[in-house]
Amino acid sequence: MGASFGIALTLVIFAGSDLFTGHTMFMTLGALRRRISLTDLSSSWAMTWLGNLAGAALLAVIFVVGGGGAMLHSKSQFLMTVATAKMNAPAIELFARAILCNWLVCLALWMAARMTNDTAKCVAIFWCLFAFIASGFEHSVANMTLLTIALLGNHPDTVNYAGLAHNLTWVTLGNIVSGALFMGAGYWFASRMPQPDLAPSMEPAE
């Protein structure tokens, strides 16, 4: 799963799509640099989050209507086990795992933005996404799709809409902390620090 999940972020970057978790970093940078207002920041976050939710729900419906493979027909399937764990995890665990997750995702976006070689971009995206999936971290937009698919399948009582709201609330907040504070504000602060002049002096030696 971790080896294949990188295609999602690759499609977002190369197709020029909008991803909420990426906006937490880029829009924060724009606001701190006074390129956009706080109103622009909040409206961008809200519209992107809602747009990602609508897209994730539509994708989940199409996937289920298309049969959904074998993962939707049994309450004991791996998908339902994962959904149950995500929907019933303590808030602090979801929050912490979401911080770590979007830190990796935003690093992938940041590196891709600085690279000109498409192959290098794909490699950077792959390893960052592989790390967050393999570590079991929490990504709000990924969970929108995964948990909606679980709700549309033959799910146990532990998979429900209250659990969906619980997960998305804490995961979204954690994603915002790492994207806006650790990455956006962090790089903004680093760029304002004076840089040492490493160029050799052109003055003649005495």
List each model region and its residues.
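Alpha-helical transmembrane segments and their helix-helix packing motifs
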Residues: 1-206
